[in-house]
Amino acid sequence: FRLDAARKVTAEGAADLVRELKEAKAQWLYLPPDSFLGTLAQDVIIPAAMEVGLPTFASTEQLMQAGALSGLVSRYHSVGQFTAHKVEQILLGKVAAETVPIETLKRFSYQIRISVAEKLKLPPPLPMFNYAEILNDAPIAQ
């Protein structure tokens, strides 16, 4: 993203940056976990990527809901349950917070949005149907 005159991040020119990536021969656009990106994904970033035929790979459920082609995501429900487990260890188990190990979830969901795959003419390889979660719907918020 670019900075404005006050040196704050701005969405201005974000679609142009996506086009520049495609012109520079990018094959995929990775969408990292970023709250500012999340606010722009559905209305700016993903439409710009679709316009130039650049597939998107999401890192969060929010970005998949915004319309990304595919992503390896942790379900927010699972993240909440895992967080509750950690809180329980600290508050009820009286474990000192600094001794609770840093861990990641052990299960992720590989998601593919079929409507986007069809538009980009990028059908998933058949073996992916054995483990991927296939999303047949449109993006959640319109």
Regions found by a protein language model. Name each.
Residues 1-142:
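Short hydrophobic alpha-helices and adjacent helix-cap/hinge residues
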